Structures are given as C-alpha cells and as structure tokens.
Curated annotation (Swiss-Prot):
One annotated GO biological process: protein export from nucleus
Membrane topology value: Lipid-anchor
Species, as recorded: Bos taurus
Modified residues (Phosphoserine): 11, 140, 339
Catalytic activity: L-seryl-[protein] + ATP = O-phospho-L-seryl-[protein] + ADP + H(+); L-threonyl-[protein] + ATP = O-phospho-L-threonyl-[protein] + ADP + H(+)
Active site location: 167 (proton acceptor)
Residues binding ATP: 50-58, 73, 122-128, 169-172
Entry protein name: cAMP-dependent protein kinase catalytic subunit alpha
Location in or out of the cell: Cytoplasm; Cell membrane; Membrane; Nucleus
C-alpha cells in the first residue's frame, strides 16, 4: 500500500471511530430511558400475516391516521413466558428502540395490552433474502459481496455498542425497495460486555464455541457472517445434515469444503471467518473488523458509499406499490384476541 493510500485508510478509520463514538452516545440515551407505549392497537388496520413464529406473528398493518404501512410483530405474553423467552423479548424491544443504522429495520412504535406485546416496524416489501436466494439458486460473488458489506458495517456498529446479534441467517435479512438489506428480528440480540453462555441461534449458523457450551463473545457473529457469505455464494450452507447433532459435529470439526467456482480470495476470507480457533478468527483479532474490511475479497468495496447507500444494488425486488405483499408467503389468518384480564403484567412491566 502506498503512503497516500495508507493515509487515506488511516483517516477513514479515524472518522469511523468518531462516528461510532457519537452513535454510542445516541444509543445510550435511549437504552437508559426506553420509549414505552407509543401507540395503540386501534390505530392500525390489520391487513395480512407476513410470517408466524412459536409465540406470535408478524402482520402487515396500515396506520389509519397517516395511511403508512408497517410490519406489526404481535407476541402472545403467555406463550413468551411458557417458552422462557421473557428476557429475549424485553432485550429485543429495548435494543430496537435504541439503535439507528441504515441496514437495521426501524422500530416505529411499541405498546402492549392485556394479552399481547406489539412492535410496529418499518415495512420492508421486498421480502426475505432467503426466498430470493432459493429462487435464484445462488448469488454471484459481487452480488454476495454487496450484501456482505452491509452486514460487516452493521456488526461493526452493533458490536461498538456491546451488542451481539446472534441470529444471522437469510430469513432475517429483508430486501428493501432500493435493493439494500434491512436486518430484522432482534429476538436473540443481547447487550454483553464480556462473555455470555446462552445456547441460541439457528443450527447451521451456530459458532463452535456456542455448541461446545463455552462462554462466547461477539466473535460468534463473525463466524455467522462466514456461514452467510458461503450460503449466498454457494446456494447452500457450509455445514448441513438432516439432524442438528450431525450439523454440530461438522461445525466443530473445523473442516469446510468449497465449491470449485469460489474465487481464491473468497475461500481465503471464509477460512479466516469459519475459523474454529478464536485466537485466529477475523473480526476477533487486534485489528478487529479492519481485518475483514481490508481483505482482498472486499478490495473493490467502497465502504463509505455502501453506508451512504450510493452503490447501485445488483437486484431490486418487484414491487407493485405500498402494501404489496407479493414477496411474502401466505399464512393462515387468525383473529387477535385480547383478554379482559391482564396477563403477565409483572413480567413485562418494562416493555
């Protein structure tokens, strides 16, 4: 690297530091004093279910006053308690209301009633990366790199706030109208200064240290980034099998095989991210995220332009207008029932 290039890199890294310091100030204000009860169910017209989960569903809704469409996550308090997800749910809302980054889905309102918790988020009509990836088969390396760069920046932001995301997978990445990523589902995100021990995540994406019940840190997100980049570029994840236990055996073995079409730069980056040895895993070394940002596979990436959303996206989802749900699957509809008695009031008092 020439002197001029090195100086440019140095000043870029300095301005990133300043940016993150300011971002942390903004985050901490909201983290310490979370917004509560900023809307009411009656203000929204419920249109269609966009997805379902073990303790709730996500619905497309329309704010009657403004006519804006949103995605409303509805969680059944009793089911959350039964599935021991109180802490995770409180974390999700507290984190989402405090963060602010171009590739994180925005929480617009949150509230609760006798039966449910509600998180009303920006509606991202392009649907999940998962469905586009399955339809197309696999993404070209430049296409995969465009998405990967956004995740790198997002993790750099989250980690600077002591947040671990812990649930990276194509199902949690929505594609917006400009073709950029919106990370959704902060159900497993957690603010951790040191290490944490909870077993959570999706089998194919779990880092070896989580499987081995070791204390783990932010490095699990960089491992998951390796899994995601592999899956985007190959069309299938690096470790897969019929049963989770077989997947776990492959993950901890430290052996990865690459398709022959992977470039040598891509393979090199993935070997450094899918690195079982934490003392060698990129993102976890003394240069932190810069080992990833300065890697040859990202040589053509203009990080600032990606952050500013100035790079032309490789793919724009089809979109027929506000409230279009054609990029989402159909689900059986169900009435939202609200009890006349308050359920689990104590458990969710801080929501």
């Amino acid at each position: 690297m020439g002197n001029a290039a090195a100086a440019k890199k140095g000043s870029e890294q300095e301005s990133v530091k300043e940016f993150l310091a300011k971002a942390k100030e903004d985050f901490l204000k909201k983290w310490e004093n979370p917004a509560q009860n900023t809307a009411h169910l009656d203000q929204f017209e419920r249109i269609k279910t966009l997805g379902t989960g073990s303790f709730g569903r996500v619905m497309l809704v329309k704010h009657m006053e403004t006519g804006n469409h949103y995605a409303m996550k509805i969680l059944d308090k009793q089911k959350v308690v039964k599935l021991k997800q109180i802490e995770h749910t409180l974390n999700e809302k507290r984190i989402l209301q405090a963060v602010n980054f171009p590739f994180l889905v925005k929480l617009e309102f949150s509230f609760k009633d006798n039966s449910n918790l509600y998180m009303v988020m920006e509606y991202v009509p392009g649907g999940e990366m998962f469905s586009h990836l399955r339809r197309i088969g696999r993404f070209s390396e430049p296409h995969a790199r465009f998405y990967a760069a956004q995740i790198v920046l997002t993790f750099e932001y989250l980690h600077s706030l002591d947040l671990i995301y812990r649930d990276l997978k194509p199902e949690n990445l929505l594609i917006d109208q400009q073709g950029y990523i919106q990370v959704t589902d902060f159900g497993f995100a957690k603010r951790v200064k040191g290490r944490t021990w909870t077993l959570c995540g999706t089998p194919e994406y779990l880092a070896p240290e989580i499987i081995l019940s070791k204390g783990y840190n932010k490095a699990v997100d960089w491992w998951a980034l390796g899994v995601l980049i592999y899956e985007m570029a190959a069309g299938y994840p690096p470790f897969f099998a019929d049963q989770p236990i077989q997947i776990y055996e492959k993950i901890v073995s430290g052996k990865v095989r690459f398709p022959s079409h992977f470039s040598s730069d891509l393979k090199d980056l993935l070997r450094n991210l899918l690195q079982v040895d934490l003392t060698k895993r990129f993102g976890n070394l003394k240069n932190g995220v810069n080992d990833i940002k300065n890697h040859k596979w990202f040589a053509t990436t203009d990080w600032i332009a990606i952050y500013q959303r100035k790079v032309e996206a490789p793919f724009i989802p089809k979109f027929k207008g506000p409230g279009d749900t054609s990029n989402f699957d159909d689900y059986e509809e169900e009435e939202i029932r609200v009890s006349i008695n308050e359920k689990c009031g104590k458990e969710f008092s801080e929501f």
